[in-house]
Design a protein with these regions (language model features):
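Multi-pass membrane catalytic core of lipid/isoprenoid biosynthesis enzymes
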Residues: 37, 41-86, 176-199
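Intramembrane alpha-helical segments
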Residues: 58-129
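Interfacial loop-to-transmembrane junctions
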Residues: 217-247
Length: 258
């Protein structure tokens, strides 16, 4: 939203957009929990989620998830604009239906496809400010699409035995650790150049360009060390979060402090 506005968006639009994103994302996550119940009960780190689901009642939980998504779509259509509504529907449906029921269960590359609905909040925020999606918004969207697979694959490497027991064909289970590490690094290596496009195409200043360059170099060094050299996948997972947050903070600082 800040990128689209080139400044702070008005409070009303900001609150409504965040409420719609939280409602749609939360509702989709709830539906994902219901649909993944049998899979999750075979994974120790997610078993408590199944216990809570059953104690609350599957029907009530599913109804709450559908209601949250429906409310988000209704508010976005009436108070924001139809582009936001369509993107919200694509994000919620893509995650709760396509990713949960199809991509994750059938393909080792489900994470790559699932990254699209996961990154749509970037375009949703942009469209809330202006329905005409700009190239800068598309670049940021693609950055989030490419960021998610290596982020998740680090987690999948750490918990690959749980995924194997649950029958989820994540990349390490389907193709092994060496292949997964190669893809992790290829995706990670694409992130710094993509972020630099925001400076190279004139959307942001040299401050962001230098920040993105330094952050990208540090991220790649840490990611290689933790995934390839030391096999500390939990740290690699955390490092990707820190990298994303720092890039977004650099973007905000570049615009708001200019």
């Amino acid at each position: 939203m800040v990128l689209a506005r080139r400044g702070v968006p008005d409070a009303g639009t900001l609150v409504l957009t965040l409420a719609c994103i939280v409602g749609a994302a939360g509702g989709s996550a709830v539906l994902n929990t219901v649909l993944d119940e049998r899979m999750d009960e075979r994974m120790p780190r997610l078993s408590r989620r199944v216990t809570l689901l059953r104690s609350a009642g599957r029907g009530r939980v599913a109804a709450a998830g559908i209601a949250a998504v429906g409310a988000a779509l209704a508010v976005s259509a009436t108070r924001l604009n139809l582009v936001v509504c369509v993107l919200l529907a694509a994000a919620a449906g893509g995650y709760a239906v396509l990713y949960t029921l199809v991509w994750k269960r059938r393909s080792p590359y489900g994470t790559v496809l699932g990254a699209v609905p996961g990154a749509l909040p970037v375009l949703i925020g942009y469209a809330a400010v202006t329905p005409r999606l700009g190239i800068d918004g598309v670049i940021l969207f693609l950055f989030l699409v490419l960021w998610q697979p290596p982020h998740f694959w680090a987690l999948a490497l750490r918990h690959q035995e749980e995924y194997r027991a649950a029958g989820v064909p994540v990349l390490p289970v389907a193709f092994g650790e060496p292949y997964t590490k190669v893809l992790i690094f290829l995706y990670a290596a694409a992130l710094p150049p993509l972020s630099l496009l925001l400076w190279a195409l004139g959307f942001l200043s040299p401050f962001f360009g230098w920040s993105a360059l330094v952050l990208g170099a540090g991220f790649l060094a840490v990611y290689y060390r933790e995934t390839v050299a030391r096999r500390r996948y939990g740290r690699a997972f955390a490092a990707s979060i820190v990298y994303l947050v720092c890039v977004m903070l650099a973007l905000l600082a570049d615009i708001l402090l200019a």
